[in-house]
UniProtKB/Swiss-Prot annotation:
The modification Phosphoserine is found at S30. This is Carbonyl reductase [NADPH] 3. It comes from Mus musculus (Mouse). NADP(+) binds at residues 10-34, 38-42, 63-64, 90, 194-198. The modification N-acetylserine is found at S2. It catalyses: a secondary alcohol + NADP(+) = a ketone + NADPH + H(+); a quinone + NADPH + H(+) = a quinol + NADP(+). Catalyzes the NADPH-dependent reduction of carbonyl compounds to their corresponding alcohols. Has low NADPH-dependent oxidoreductase activity. Acts on several orthoquinones, as well as on non-quinone compounds, such as isatin or on the anticancer drug oracin. Best substrates for CBR3 is 1,2- naphthoquinone, hence could play a role in protection against cytotoxicity of exogenous quinones. Exerts activity toward ortho-quinones but not paraquinones. No endogenous substrate for CBR3 except isatin has been identified. Signal peptide: none annotated.
Length: 277
């Protein structure tokens, strides 16, 4: 594979929204599309399903919870393509509303994958993004709702334009710690681990976009978060009002923003419209 080849990559892509995004990119992106999944058998089965539709994604194993797995993927992309053109961070988890798992465990597990692991993917793959690259973090309006349900001093911190990545990581760690000590409500946090994890993803998006502006402005990389809406997936227990194809529309729109585009950047986008933060 020549390092001149363009490549797009989707995490958590063996089913649901990730699978629909991959299918759409296979149709619309001029270059290779890499479908990644934690489970190799499920990932390869998803690739075969798309091949049966006349599409030709590649497969690479990726467990975002495993830093070594992320680094192996980074090395593959560097060797095969000399970098990465499009990254869609879709992998994530959510507990059922009626799940009996104690809230502090739900908080730790949810933030580990949705926030900390997503951040690790960005840490390893952003440095190999090529000029005019596009990064899309799948977030949720649940994150915005969580922000609104935070105490005012916490809201101010999350909205602050000078909040650093280290500050944000400390805040996310504090939420997990506060749930363990059963003081999260007293400390001003909302009662949704998923919401806080997606709040973290959206604020991380704002911070990483700012970093790109400071360090690589000439490369015109655009990095955004988006809410796909309430989609009929396993995660939503098929309760959603949107199809996975509808859920994929905004992520794919952001992934394929034209090379001369300068915005959106560092935004939360739903239905192709920037949301007020």
């Amino acid at each position: 594979m020549s390092s001149c080849s363009r490549v797009a990559l989707v995490t958590g892509a063996n089913k649901g929204i990730g699978f629909a995004i991959t299918r759409d990119l296979c149709r619309k992106f001029s270059g290779d599309v890499v479908l990644t999944a934690r489970d190799e058998a499920r990932g390869r089965a998803a690739v075969q399903q798309l091949q049966a539709e006349g599409l030709s994604p590649r497969f690479h194993q990726l467990d975002i919870d495993d830093p070594q797995s992320i680094r192996a993927l980074r090395d593959f992309l560097r060797k095969e393509y000399g970098g990465l053109n499009v990254l869609v961070n879709n992998a994530g988890i959510a507990f059922r509303m009626d799940d009996p798992t104690p809230f502090d465990i739900q908080a730790e597990v949810t933030l580990k994958t949705n926030f900390f692991a997503t951040r690790n993917v960005c840490t390893e793959l952003l440095p190999i993004m090529k000029p005019h690259g596009r990064v899309v973090n799948i977030s949720s309006l649940q994150g915005l709702k969580a922000l609104e349900n935070c105490r005012e001093d916490l809201q101010e911190k999350f909205r602050c334009d000078t909040l650093t990545e280290v500050d944000l990581v400390d805040l996310m760690k504090k939420f997990v710690e506060d749930t363990k000590n059963e003081v999260h409500e007293r400390e001003g946090w909302p009662d949704s681990a998923y919401g806080v994890s997606k709040l973290g993803v959206t604020v991380l998006t704002r911070i990483l976009a700012r970093q790109l502006d400071e360090k690589r402005k000439a490369d015109r990389i655009l990095l955004n978060a988006c809410c796909p809406g309430w989609v009929k997936t396993d995660m939503a227990r098929d309760q959603g009002s949107r199809t996975v194809e509808e859920g994929a529309e905004t992520p794919v729109y952001l992934a394929l923003l034209p090379p001369d585009a300068t915005e959106p950047h560092g935004q939360l986008v739903r239905d192709k419209v920037v949301q007020t933060w």
